[in-house]
């Protein structure tokens, strides 16, 4: 499964971004879609998980759709202090906030980062959109952020609970922000989810297998031929068809 970008972005541009998007917003969503297509779609993950991850990103980044650093960079928290061994500070980074050294190291193990890719030793790598997307998907599926809450608990064959799913990231679903016109955080994200799910479903396209692509390509070939007609006085007319090289 792949997603037609024109269809997807046309949908969310209207429903979520007031008719216009900045390039960083497009780039952030592109990173999320690309990570899904490359790493997760082959595993048969539920598209509702993708839609909820996009909705969470929309909320957590204040619609910027780019990985962000935790406000205050962990000031007053143990994880806001520089680690003596690595020289890194493990405050929150990403589309959703990855915090604490143990979690940065866990991301390295789970996602098989090595060398200069390692988040434990290069914490700002968590701000790269492709890395942030993979951390978000793995963390939300495996309950890294608020155990035991994960995608599968809220989106499965019998359940679709985008309101309750806020528990995956934060227990603030009942809180009503001053700017929200009386709508709770859980219901705000539920609304974003519904719009992202529409865009995801509208843009989903089955990707052809390589042999099917070759077959279609061969059917579309135009074959040029050379026709030679030989006419003799007493014999039959003969026609020789020779395909051009």
Regions found by a protein language model. Name each.
Residues 44:
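Metal- and O2-centered redox machinery and metal/ROS homeostasis
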Residues 2-31, 40, 49-140:
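Peptidoglycan-targeting cell-wall enzymes and recognition modules
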Residues 57-60, 150-177:
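Acidic helix/loop microenvironments that form the catalytic cleft of cell-wall polysaccharide enzymes
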Residues 206-207, 211-215, 219-221:
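Intrinsically disordered, low-complexity segments used as extracellular stalks/linkers
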Residues 217-245:
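Short, low-complexity, charged amphipathic interaction modules
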Residues 133-157, 161:
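GST-like fold's C-terminal all-alpha helical module
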Residues 190-200:
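Protruding loop/beta-arch "assembly-hinge" segments enriched in small, turn-prone residues
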Residues 175-192:
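A short acidic/glycine-rich loop-to-helix N-cap element
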């Amino acid at each position: 499964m792949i997603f037609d970008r024109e269809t997807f972005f046309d949908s969310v541009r209207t429903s979520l971004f007031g008719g216009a998007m900045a390039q960083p917003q497009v780039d952030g969503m592109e990173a999320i879609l690309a990570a899904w297509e490359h790493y997760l779609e082959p595993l048969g993950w539920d598209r509702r998980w993708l839609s909820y991850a996009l909705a969470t990103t929309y909320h957590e980044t204040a619609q910027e759709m780019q990985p962000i650093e935790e406000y205050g960079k962990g000031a007053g928290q143990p994880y806001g202090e520089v680690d003596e061994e690595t020289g890194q500070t493990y405050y929150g980074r990403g589309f959703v906030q990855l915090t604490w050294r143990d979690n940065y190291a866990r991301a390295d193990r789970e996602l098989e980062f090595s060398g200069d890719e390692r988040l434990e030793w290069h914490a700002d790598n968590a701000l790269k959109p492709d890395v942030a997307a993979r951390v978000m998907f793995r963390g939300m599926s495996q309950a890294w952020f608020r155990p035991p809450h994960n995608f599968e608990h809220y989106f499965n064959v019998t359940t679709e609970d985008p309101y309750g799913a806020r528990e995956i990231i934060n227990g603030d679903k009942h809180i009503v922000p001053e700017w929200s016109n009386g709508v709770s955080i859980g219901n705000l994200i539920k609304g974003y989810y519904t719009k992202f799910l529409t865009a995801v479903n509208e843009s989903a396209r089955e990707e052809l297998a390589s042999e099917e692509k070759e077959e279609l390509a061969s059917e579309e070939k135009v074959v040029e031929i050379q026709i030679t007609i030989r006419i003799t006085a007493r014999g039959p007319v003969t026609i020789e068809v020779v395909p051009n090289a």
